[in-house]
Structures are given as C-alpha cells and as structure tokens.
C-alpha cells in the first residue's frame, strides 16, 4: 500500500500564513497539516509516500527531508490548474504502484486526519474506496453560519456512492461529506489512467476546463462509468483547513 499527497496549492485564503510556505505547512494546533497526514499514513503501515508540490515546492521539499520522501513531483502550473492535474503530475509513481502491485491512497494536503481513518480505508478491498463523513454537519456548523453554503452533495445506494461534489440545495442531498481521502486498487489504477487519457480536453467539467477539473468531477465521471465507489464511512475525527477560522476549530471524535 502506497500513498500520494497532493500539495501543490497556494492557500490564498490563509494569507499571510502562506506567504513563505505552502498551504500544507500551515500549523494547526502546533503541528503542520502535512505532519498530521504523514504520521497518520506511516502509523497505519504505509511507508512509501509520494508528494506533489507546486507553490514554494522547494520549501516543502526541504521540510520533507526529515521523512525521507523519495518521490517528490512538481506541478509547475499549480496556479493555473487544479487537483486532477496535480495528481497526474505523479503518473510515474502510479505506474510504479501498478508494476509493484501496490494499492494507492490519495490525500488532499489541507485535511487533518488520523491513523484510524487511514486504517478504515486500507481495510476496504474495493477497486475504488472513498472516505466520507456521516457526521459532517457538526463540523460544517462550526465552520459556517449556513453549512449548505459550502457543503456538496453526496448520495449513496447500498453503501456505494452514486453522486458527489455538486452544489447542495438541501440537507437531504447530503448523506455524508467527501473529505479528500480515497484509494484506488492497483488493478483499477490502470483503468483510471486510461480513462483520464481518453477524456475530451476541449469540453468543460462542472464548468471547469480540463486542466482545472475538480477531483470530485473526475471521481463522478469514474462513478458514472464503473459504478464501483465504495463509501468508507467515518464519524468526525478530522477537519479541513481552508480558512483562518478553521485553525480554531476543535476536532470532534
């Protein structure tokens, strides 16, 4: 089992904390976000971790020396692209996972989570497994006056996700919340690469051009083709760091 952390982002809403460091290096409760992630992954037994940097990638790479991260990729167009493009900057690492028959966990770099969450994801044996928070509203109520302003749809049937990432207009459209942590089996990863490379570069995906496609748009496209996205349900014990106010939010277990 391997993992990749997508850490190319600038984090403009966290300025001035991101003036001299990338978003993932901002501290939450006296520890950098990426430290929480690497520690959670390693404590769950994942030792081969790749990172994709972008904004101030040299600062990040130097910081990661203490973890002996061997696989560091750069999204040089971090300011013009989105998460899917960042992910495929590490295609060589994906191919390595396939060759060595290692499943791959994908993590956003602005979320704080712990070993128990990673372990649940590891335990899911499906081709595509996505962590979702059933208790999302507790966290969103702390973060926003109106949780629906930021929350996205997530609908499930028999434990499998059929829709995610759309603008939610009502609470009954949100059975859980996508957190930015998921896993591809090494067998399915071959399909994922082929699927990505066959996508039309000239159309919009949820009103975004190809290079700015949201990860949720890409996952939704995979769901519509393969219908294989297993929901790995958690109840809190994580948070997203997107705004200065998020740094004051207490994680509920």
Swiss-Prot record:
It is an enzyme of class 2 (transferase). Keywords: Capsule biogenesis/degradation, Nucleotidyltransferase, Transferase. Pathway: Capsule biogenesis; capsule polysaccharide biosynthesis. One of its GO terms (biological process) is capsule polysaccharide biosynthetic process. Gene3D superfamilies: Spore Coat Polysaccharide Biosynthesis Protein SpsA, Chain A (3.90.550.10). Its EC number is 2.7.7.103. This enzyme is able to catalyze reactions that produce natural compounds CDP-ethanolamine, CDP-1-glycerol and CDP-2-glycerol, two of which are not available commercially. It can also produce CDP-serine, CDP-serinol and CDP-3-D-glycerate which may be potential inhibitors or mechanistic probes for enzymes that use CDP-glycerol. The labeled nucleotides, such as beta-[(18)O4]-CDP, generated with this enzyme can be used to probe the details of enzyme-catalyzed reactions using positional isotope exchange (PIX) and molecular isotope exchange (MIX) techniques. Disulfide bonds: none annotated. GO terms for molecular function: cytidylyltransferase activity. Disruption phenotype: Mutant does not express the MeOPN CPS modification. The keyword Transferase applies. It holds the Pfam family NTP_transferase. Coiled coil: none annotated. It catalyses: N(5)-phospho-L-glutamine + CTP + H(+) = N(5)-(cytidine 5'-diphosphoramidyl)-L-glutamine + diphosphate. Involved in the biosynthesis of the O-methyl phosphoramidate (MeOPN) group found on the capsular polysaccharide (CPS) of C.jejuni. Catalyzes the formation of CDP-L-glutamine from CTP and L-glutamine phosphate. In the presence of MnCTP, catalyzes the displacement of pyrophosphate from CTP using phosphoramidate, methyl phosphate, methyl phosphonate, phosphate, arsenate, ethanolamine phosphate, (R/S)-glycerol-1-phosphate, glycerol-2-phosphate, serinol phosphate, L-serine phosphate and 3-phospho-D-glycerate as substrate in addition to L-glutamine phosphate. This is CTP:phosphoglutamine cytidylyltransferase.
